[in-house]
Amino acid sequence: MQNINPKIQDKINKIIYLQDEIKKWEEKDEFEIESLMKNFEKMTRIEGSVFYTKYFTDEEFANILLAIARKYPDNKSIIIDIITSLGMMITRYKLNETEEIYTFMLEYSSQKGISAYVSIYFPFLKRFEKHPNQWEYYMSMRKMTPKKIAQQKLVGIIEQNINNIPEKYKGEIIHFIKERHDAANNDFGKKMYLEMIEKIK
């Protein structure tokens, strides 16, 4: 049996404990679930390790998270923590992305105060490749809240796709990048945005 670093073992124990408690969610009240989800979501974002993979790729557990989301659709804290948990489990640990998870993300992709958290993961889901208008979605990120999260993600997406921007969106994107340039408070940021604009033109 492979020796596991004691610090990693402590984190594994915490993940197991949280998952076991979340699995008993129907016995708990909304406040308890909110607290458990907040702590579990944090565990999906800690420094990655192969030792966590089996826990974060558990499809049965992912379905429990979706069931909780269906039960508490108006609890913003629970929904955001489930979005982040599933997003990290898919993008970092390669949890199988199901139609149900994609639909769940899609449902909240334009909801005020939540859509920005969806935008961190939604464009990187396999099924997003079949989204009828990817660039329309990207452009909608400019108005998502929390603004800082969504706009930082949009800058990253523009950088990754800088040579594939459809002509019809170039003007809007350059305008957005100019706004970011003007708001930047350091020379490095301003230079980066100017270079992006030159590449887009």
Model-derived features: where do they sit?
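Eukaryotic acidic, Ser/Thr-rich intrinsically disordered low-complexity regions
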Residues: 2-15, 19, 160, 166-201
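Alpha-helical adaptor scaffolds
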Residues: 74, 82-83, 87-146
